[in-house]
Amino acid sequence: MADLITVARPYAEALYGLAKESGQEQAWADALQALAAMIADVQAQAFLTDPERADAEKVSLLSAVPVAVDVKAWKAFLALLIHNDRWPATAEIGTLFADAMRRAEGVVDVLVTSAIALDAGQKTAVQSALERRFAGHKVAFREAVDAALIGGLVIHTGDLTIDASVRGQVQQLARTLRS
């Protein structure tokens, strides 16, 4: 997963720049989402991995995705994905593109994982702390439960992870004792 994110990042950034220039951010996001759905299909994957198929045939298949963006730019993007064999990273490109859109809108997506479900007061306290931490941004708060944390929280947004869980502290202690 991390490798695909690394591969996807320059494509997502370049596409976002192109989309922003043309004012078609949402249209490109929709096109990437449709492309990712097509590529998720087992038959499409078999076609794309078939060494007997020419790159032009593969681009033609992917071009069947209906899009509301500049067709020339779309086909150039598809040709680049196929030529560089980066089509498996399409879903990640779409995710990173959507992340870039949300950042431009001033929204920070945050996933808060706790050992047990947070009550309303705890959610409010965490939300307030996150809004202070990310001042000037709107915080989109999602919650998950992972009993393996034992206690505490793990907060994840983009490349930032804050592990304030009991499990994380025990793991850190174990690393310290081993060194």
Curated annotation (Swiss-Prot):
Query: Which InterPro entries is this protein grouped with?
Result: ATP_synth_OSCP/delta_N_sf (IPR026015), ATPase_OSCP/d_CS (IPR020781), ATPase_OSCP/dsu (IPR000711)
A GO term for molecular function: proton-transporting ATP synthase activity, rotational mechanism
What keywords appear on the UniProt entry?
Answer: ATP synthesis, Cell inner membrane, Cell membrane, CF(1), Hydrogen ion transport, Ion transport, Membrane, Transport
Give the source's domain of life in one word.
Bacteria
Give a single Pfam family match.
Answer: OSCP
PROSITE patterns (UniProt xref): ATPASE_DELTA
User: Which GO terms of the cellular component aspect does the record hold?
Assistant: plasma membrane; proton-transporting ATP synthase complex
Sequence intervals crossing the membrane = none
Gene3D superfamilies given for it? N-terminal domain of the delta subunit of the F1F0-ATP synthase
Protein localization? Cell inner membrane
* Membrane topology annotation: Peripheral membrane protein
Q: What do we know about how this protein assembles, alone or with others?
A: F-type ATPases have 2 components, F(1) - the catalytic core - and F(0) - the membrane proton channel. F(1) has five subunits: alpha(3), beta(3), gamma(1), delta(1), epsilon(1). F(0) has three main subunits: a(1), b(2) and c(10-14). The alpha and beta chains form an alternating ring which encloses part of the gamma chain. F(1) is attached to F(0) by a central stalk formed by the gamma and epsilon chains, while a peripheral stalk is formed by the delta and b chains.
Tell me which family the UniProt entry assigns to this protein: Belongs to the ATPase delta chain family.
- Free-text function comment from the UniProt entry: F(1)F(0) ATP synthase produces ATP from ADP in the presence of a proton or sodium gradient. F-type ATPases consist of two structural domains, F(1) containing the extramembraneous catalytic core and F(0) containing the membrane proton channel, linked together by a central stalk and a peripheral stalk. During catalysis, ATP synthesis in the catalytic domain of F(1) is coupled via a rotary mechanism of the central stalk subunits to proton translocation. This protein is part of the stalk that links CF(0) to CF(1). It either transmits conformational changes from CF(0) to CF(1) or is implicated in proton conduction.
Recorded protein name is ATP synthase subunit delta
Q: Which organism is it from?
A: Acidithiobacillus ferrooxidans (strain ATCC 23270 / DSM 14882 / CIP 104768 / NCIMB 8455) (Ferrobacillus ferrooxidans (strain ATCC 23270))
UniProt lists the gene as atpH
